[in-house]
Amino acid sequence: MMLSWKQLILLSFIGCLAGELLLQGPVFVKEPSNSIFPVGSEDKKITLNCEARGNPSPHYRWQLNGSDIDTSLDHRYKLNGGNLIVINPNRNWDTGSYQCFATNSLGTIVSREAKLQFAYLENFKSRMRSRVSVREGQGVVLLCGPPPHSGELSYAWVFNEYPSFVEEDSRRFVSQETGHLYIAKVEPSDVGNYTCVVTSTVTNARVLGSPTPLVLRSDGVMGEYEPKIELQFPETLPAAKGSTVKLECFALGNPVPQINWRRSDGMPFPTKIKLRKFNGVLEIPNFQQEDTGSYECIAENSRGKNVARGRLTYYAKPYWVQLLKDVETAVEDSLYWECRASGKPKPSYRWLKNGDALVLEERIQIENGALTIANLNVSDSGMFQCIAENKHGLIYSSAELKVLASAPDFSRNPMKKMIQVQVGSLVILDCKPSASPRALSFWKKGDTVVREQARISLLNDGGLKIMNVTKADAGIYTCIAENQFGKANGTTQLVVTEPTRIILAPSNMDVAVGESIILPCQVQHDPLLDIMFAWYFNGTLTDFKKDGSHFEKVGGSSSGDLMIRNIQLKHSGKYVCMVQTGVDSVSSAAELIVRGSPGPPENVKVDEITDTTAQLSWTEGTDSHSPVISYAVQARTPFSVGWQNVRTVPEAIDGKTRTATVVELNPWVEYEFRVVASNKIGGGEPSLPSEKVRTEEAAPEVAPSEVSGGGGSRSELVITWDPVPEELQNGGGFGYVVAFRPLGVTTWIQTVVTSPDNPRYVFRNESIVPFSPYEVKVGVYNNKGEGPFSPVTTVFSAEEEPTVAPSHISAHSLSSSEIEVSWNTIPWKSSNGRLLGYEVRYWNNGGEEESSSKVKVAGNQTSAVLRGLKSNLAYYTAVRAYNTAGAGPFSATVNATTKKTPPSQPPGNVVWNATDTKVLLNWEQVKALENESEVTGYKVFYRTSSQNNVQVLNTNKTSAELLLPIKEDYIIEVKATTDGGDGTSSEQIRIPRITSMDARGSTSAISDIHPVSGYISVLLFFIVNALW
């Protein structure tokens, strides 16, 4: 169909306007859904939702049962946006099918149908029900007969009084299909009144029917009879896809029948099928095509069985397989628009345009649901809906058809301003303006029309393809596009550059761990192009910031050299230098092999174990690009300090060997093994340890060491040794064999010590002579046998303790804190042992003997000084001898009183006077207090300042004269002497070296004395009138 020029101009304008404003036909966001309104609800309105988007915004109208709803005339209806509000819904007027229409300037769409129903439940008619008489053992069905209602119901039965409901079990069943109560076998306890209770699942309203009395007949008990199926499902039952299907089945009979289910074709039930209410209900959730077929309910008791059969058929409402999609096309084109749905039965199709049935004509046809329109024009634009329906439902799919008419326009898809390519390459210059219908295109280079030739082709989409580009192809290219509505043009500058070349490429390298290298990558490129370098390692782009510790790009603007520092094994692999410009890219690759010490061997296993050997095997780890030349085996036990190298056979394990025998192991010890590989680079990491294994048992081979003994109590022979370490015991059940005999006797006495940790054995016998020599040896044994004995050594039996007390005990005080005790030695025979010494026990007269203190002295001493005593206090003491066998009796007790303490007052006002080499000292007399010892004299202590040896001068006067050499400082102090010891020292006085013929001083002048620097020998002479 040809259009006039006026129509063309108008269509072009409309197409441009539509593009500018982005107009869009209505699209539903919300559609109404089926609703059930409870009659008598407190809510006095119901809302049916409808919302659509579009530009311009849609407006709405509604239909009920195909007739328009005029909200301006009927005030029970109100529109809120697109939502329809029904005020005070009435089941007589408002029940039916509702549809929403959304319209804007581009067209109209219709919503799916939404059914509004009203749920109600009326009361039972008030009439008495006849009583039901049955014999005991007979089955019975009590009918419910629900009142008029709308909406789904649930049923229950009350026994006698509400709310005592009948409990369902294998004997009693309430059908949710019929509402009836089924009792398979009546018992006397069933007698009573039964009331049917009906509940609306929508409104929750509940009504009760009239009671039905159930009584027993008096003509006897019903005998046994085979099952009679009273409740069964239909012979044919359609089931919707995805629904939950419930089949009920119940039988009367005596005994009470057992209900079972099966498929007639013998196929087992899938796991989703559930049996409920004591098998009275078969439930199939999410019903699918494979669940169709014949099902059987079998009721069986001891008198026989009965079977009910029914077939489930499958149906599915239509559902979309392919939805409509918006179409935008040009005038005079053809349209093929397909929507596809599935369902059972197979859906049929019809189409709407702007809410009305599509009118078919010669160029508009529908076939198998697909719409075809030939020679499109703008008036074909609008909103289209495909409806798929079968007897179970219908569905809608909506889309917009835009038929465009416009002149070529490059604004939406402009041509590239510049394209850069290299000499010899292929380039395509695009020319894709928007145009309806599609524009025809031709090209110009400068002012010259481009013609097709061997290297140049005009493409069907309007593009220009140039192969094997040369420098002469560079220039400005213009595409001129034209259709019946107008024409437009666009330009592209083609820039032709020289190709980029790598002039110094990286090469394969072989390095060792820890080295640093540079992989070169230098290029020659067109100066018009910016260049960028990138390195890939094993296909991954190198991040120089993240991996800067190892990788760095070095070189100038035309170089992308890669420096790799401190190379590690992980750096082995393929390196690619990628050079990229705006028009091309080149790359070059090199392999880097990094050699290092080998990785740990793997799968170390102990294949065979004996008492002293272990057969090992392992597999090779990574060789780190350097072949393994040797292996070493290490072992660890609970007794070793870390891992130790062990001996193997072969002694030297070469790099091709994967097995070795470890020798010289200790029996009955738990070992772990590991293997270390070495190559010419060095030793690698050790393998993971093998599993722990224990060597087999063997007889012990090591005897105890340090065998000795002695001591103990009378009539004992004590034998000691160092226990054999656990790792040398060679097996379980380890112990010691102790052998001994008196010196000169040939027969050994043997005994066993079963504890491997026991280092001692004591032999007791009254016949043992004290301190007699024995030959002793200690051997070993375990579960596998006996081992060697230690060398024979001599051990003496226990000594005899002393039996005599020391005699002639005496004690006298030495000072205020010391008492000397003396005694005579006891008579002693060497055959009785060795006398170790004496023990002196002492206590004061205020203490108890049991809490006494003790002092021990060697056996050759006959006196002891007790120190640290309290002053002026009587102490009691006794002495006894002792040896290794024990201690003898104590001597008689003696006592002595410590002297009073020395005076606490030091000699005061010490003054000195030096003449020539003489020094005259004077001091004040010290007077003792009542509780202090009397002063018996004084001691003058003096030494040179450079020596520590102190000289002492005793005197009973308060003065002393010293003859001292010159040229030396002297330190002097004075103490009082008493029977209780020396008193408190005076302050030290320093006498400087004598440099003049006359000098004097006192203790108050000490701080003015300067130290001397020389050292001379001290010659001390003193002249005193001492009385001794």
Swiss-Prot record:
Tissues in which the UniProt entry reports expression: Specifically expressed in brain. Not expressed in peripheral tissues such as heart, lung, liver, spleen, kidney and skeletal muscle. In brain, it is restricted to subsets of neurons such as Purkinje cells of the cerebellum, granule cells of the dentate gyrus, and neurons in the superficial layers of the cerebral cortex.
Keyword Cell membrane listed: yes
Bilayer topology: Lipid-anchor; GPI-anchor
Family annotation (Pfam families): fn3, I-set, Ig_3
Domain of life assignment: Eukaryota
Region (Disordered) location: 684-714
Glycosylated sites: 65, 193, 377, 468, 489, 538, 765, 860, 895, 913, 931, 956
Residues of the Ig-like C2-type domain: 26-117, 122-208, 227-313, 318-402, 408-497, 499-593
InterPro entries in the record: FN3_dom, FN3_sf, Ig-like_dom, Ig-like_dom_sf, Ig-like_fold, Ig_I-set, Ig_sub, Ig_sub2
Subcellular location: Cell membrane
Propiece residue ranges: 1003-1028
Covalent lipidation (GPI-anchor amidated serine), chain numbering: 1002
Domain Fibronectin type-III as annotated: residue spans: 600-698, 703-800, 805-901, 902-998
Residues of the signal peptide: 1-19
Primary site of residence: membrane
Annotated Gene Ontology cellular component terms: neuron projection; plasma membrane; side of membrane
Entry's Gene Ontology BP terms: cell adhesion; neuron projection development
Bridged cysteine pairs (disulfide): 50-100, 144-196, 249-297, 339-386, 431-479, 521-577
Keywords: Cell adhesion, Cell membrane, Disulfide bond, Glycoprotein, GPI-anchor, Immunoglobulin domain, Lipoprotein, Membrane, Repeat, Signal
UniProt record similarity statement: Belongs to the immunoglobulin superfamily. Contactin family.
Free-text function comment from the UniProt entry: Contactins mediate cell surface interactions during nervous system development. Has some neurite outgrowth-promoting activity.
Assembly and oligomerization: Interacts with PTPRG.
Annotated protein name in UniProt: Contactin-3
Gene: Cntn3
